[in-house]
Amino acid sequence: MPSLPHSHRVMLDSVTHSTFLPNASFCDPLMSWTDLFSNEEYYPAFEHQTACDSYWTSVHPEYWTKRHVWEWLQFCCDQYKLDTNCISFCNFNISGLQLCSMTQEEFVEAAGLCGEYLYFILQNIRTQGYSFFNDAEESKATIKDYADSNCLKTSGIKSQDCHSHSRTSLQSSHLWEFVRDLLLSPEENCGILEWEDREQGIFRVVKSEALAKMWGQRKKNDRMTYEKLSRALRYYYKTGILERVDRRLVYKFGKNAHGWQEDKL
């Protein structure tokens, strides 16, 4: 594993001995990455082109130091064009173990819509290892599919959208909530989805392309296909929101899904 260039080591050492100090007076919770490091004298631009150039890739995420966490965040922002104004630096002044223990909701609270993106990337590293980045184009395509299906913008998440989650009716910004609400709204469903076992939370996609078209219309994404949508649905297996069912087009709500049970609506 190649070592970091001298300029990066100097910069990271500076970060370690200043911004990571628990009593750093200028570490405003609302301060963004660009606020902290806009001066090139203290924040020379990273030249990462691939993950293997980054030192954080030599360590399992649970063993990352605060410096590794910072480096990983910077890589994600550079590689996937995340708006750094969405991310509060102080919210990620933590170790890798603390980072890995964060839930998706905590990522969203810490970084808005960027938080969903970061959570998705971290979970892929934890399950696939750094091989997730071996094919840069493939990893970008995977993340792009997730972004397309969850109203994220791969061309750059705008800061005004950082906390724009809506969880009402069929306007929910989470795909699984949209599916849930569609199941609970016969007047909107039009035979697109149907329950197979209401009590167990098992349902079937009857009209796959119609579902993709409706979701695309809700998110103003005319490129949405069921292939992309189903990839995003399968991602929910990792979070416990959906559970795998060994039948085509059939899904089941998991332990972390809410609002679908008749007695808990």
From Swiss-Prot:
Record bears the keyword Transcription regulation: yes
Record remark: domains: The PNT domain acts as a transcriptional activator.
SMART domains (alphabetical): ETS (SM00413), SAM_PNT (SM00251)
Gene3D superfamilies: Transcription Factor, Ets-1, Winged helix-like DNA-binding domain superfamily/Winged helix DNA-binding domain
Organism per entry: Homo sapiens
Domain PNT: 43-129
Protein family: Belongs to the ETS family.
Localisation per UniProt entry: Nucleus
Start-end of DNA-binding region: 173-254
GO molecular function: DNA-binding transcription activator activity, RNA polymerase II-specific; DNA-binding transcription factor activity, RNA polymerase II-specific; RNA polymerase II transcription regulatory region sequence-specific DNA binding; sequence-specific double-stranded DNA binding
Tissue: Expressed exclusively in tissues with a high content of epithelial cells. Highly expressed in salivary gland, mammary gland, kidney and prostate. Weakly expressed in placenta and lung. Isoform 1 and isoform 2 are differentially expressed in different tissues. In the kidney, only isoform 1 was expressed, while prostate expressed both isoforms, with levels of isoform 2 being higher. Expression is up-regulated during keratinocyte differentiation. Several epithelial carcinoma cell lines showed lack of expression.
Gene it is expressed from: ELF5
Alphabetic keyword roster: Activator, DNA-binding, Nucleus, Transcription, Transcription regulation
GO biological process per UniProt: cell differentiation; ectodermal cell fate commitment; mammary gland epithelial cell differentiation; negative regulation of cell differentiation involved in embryonic placenta development; regulation of transcription by RNA polymerase II; somatic stem cell population maintenance; trophoblast giant cell differentiation
The protein, known as: ETS-related transcription factor Elf-5
Any Gene Ontology CC annotation: nucleus
Top-level taxon: Eukaryota
Protein purpose: Transcriptionally activator that may play a role in regulating the later stages of keratinocytes terminal differentiation.
